[in-house]
């Protein structure tokens, strides 16, 4: 029996609708409009698409959207000055610097300059440290989306065996912490791990975030496992076109797993939706309101 497909589009749309409902409520009850500022340095086409999408979805949720476009040759000091302004702006509750940054800019210093209370990407060392300590924190959006997708299949993750393939600061490491917070039993692996197929076959939950196209094969999977594919690779297709595939061999996984996220249409849909969640949570925390019900 083929696995079920975890539809990220549907789950993300539901999450965005719930965020919009909470925004409407806090506007009505408290006169507060959450605001998200996005900083884009340079003119990378993919980054421009992401920023436009974030702007559109932020406004659709009823939030204020602020875009700051800087040239690729901007000085580090000018980026830091802009972040200082946004930190001090009461209309801005969330700050996101679109990554990657052009060469010559110190990404770590720029991320560290963001007020941790407004760090809706969850990358500031303060938030990363709190997450690692099992404390409440703004969490990176993609791992947060992975947890929500998993919970669409499993009401509780407690006691489940999970493997995270990938150890990046953006996805792998924070995802491990979020899974631990859910009382899952977690193995963290990567492209150089020994006996990786064997490790995967033990797991109820498989998270592939290593950036290697179709690395995880169907015979790596435990029958009935839930598979969350974070990877995204563009490969040639017919008629000179390209298509997107993930880190998991999707057709093979569908014959073994219990549930699988597609690429596209899976994890990617959740990232911006979770950015809206983080912005809403940040706004409520900054303004001293109770945590939103999303």
Swiss-Prot record:
One of its GO terms (cellular component) is cytosol. It catalyses: (6R)-5,10-methylene-5,6,7,8-tetrahydrofolate + NADP(+) = (6R)-5,10-methenyltetrahydrofolate + NADPH; (6R)-5,10-methenyltetrahydrofolate + H2O = (6R)-10-formyltetrahydrofolate + H(+). Pathway: One-carbon metabolism; tetrahydrofolate interconversion. Its EC number is 1.5.1.5, 3.5.4.9. Keywords: Amino-acid biosynthesis, Histidine biosynthesis, Hydrolase, Methionine biosynthesis, Multifunctional enzyme, NADP, One-carbon metabolism, Oxidoreductase, Purine biosynthesis. Gene3D superfamilies: Leucine Dehydrogenase, chain A, domain 1, NAD(P)-binding Rossmann-like Domain. One of its GO terms (biological process) is tetrahydrofolate interconversion. It comes from the Bacteria. The keyword Mitochondrion does not apply. NADP(+) binds at residues 166-168, 191, 232. Belongs to the tetrahydrofolate dehydrogenase/cyclohydrolase family. PANTHER family: C-1-TETRAHYDROFOLATE SYNTHASE, CYTOPLASMIC, C-1-TETRAHYDROFOLATE SYNTHASE, CYTOPLASMIC-RELATED. HAMAP family: THF_DHG_CYH (MF_01576). Homodimer. This is Bifunctional protein FolD. It comes from Nitrobacter winogradskyi (strain ATCC 25391 / DSM 10237 / CIP 104748 / NCIMB 11846 / Nb-255). The lineage of its organism: Bacteria, Pseudomonadati, Pseudomonadota, Alphaproteobacteria, Hyphomicrobiales.
């Amino acid at each position: 029996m083929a696995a079920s497909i975890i539809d990220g589009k549907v789950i993300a749309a539901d999450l965005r609708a719930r965020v919009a409902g909470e925004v409407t409520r806090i506007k009505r009850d408290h006169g507060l409009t959450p605001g998200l500022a996005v900083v884009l340095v340079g003119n990378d086409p993919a980054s421009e698409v992401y920023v436009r999408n974030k702007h559109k979805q932020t406004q659709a949720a009823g939030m204020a959207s602020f875009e700051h476009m800087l040239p690729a040759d901007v000085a580090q000091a000018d980026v830091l000055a802009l972040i200082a302004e946004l930190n001090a702006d009461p209309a801005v509750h969330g700050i996101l610097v679109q990554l990657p940054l052009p060469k010559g800019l110190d990404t770590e210093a720029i991320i560290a300059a963001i007020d941790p209370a407004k760090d809706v990407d969850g990358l500031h060392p303060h938030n990363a440290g709190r997450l690692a300590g099992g404390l409440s924190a703004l969490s990176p959006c993609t791992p947060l989306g992975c947890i929500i997708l998993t919970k669409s299949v499993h009401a509780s993750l407690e006691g489940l065996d999970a493997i995270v393939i990938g150890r990046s600061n953006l996805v792998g490491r924070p995802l491990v912490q979020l899974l631990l917070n859910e009382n899952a039993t977690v193995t963290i692996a990567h492209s150089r791990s020994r006996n990786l197929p064997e490790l995967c076959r033990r797991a109820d939950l498989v998270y592939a975030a290593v950036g290697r196209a179709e690395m995880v094969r169907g015979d790596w999977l435990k029958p009935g496992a839930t598979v969350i594919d974070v990877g995204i690779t563009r490969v040639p297709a017919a008629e000179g076109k390209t298509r997107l595939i993930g880190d998991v061999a999707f057709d093979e996984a569908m014959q073994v797993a219990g549930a699988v996220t597609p690429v596209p249409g899976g994890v990617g849909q959740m990232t911006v939706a979770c950015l809206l969640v983080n912005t809403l949570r940040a706004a409520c925390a900054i303004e001293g309101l109770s945590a939103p019900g999303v």
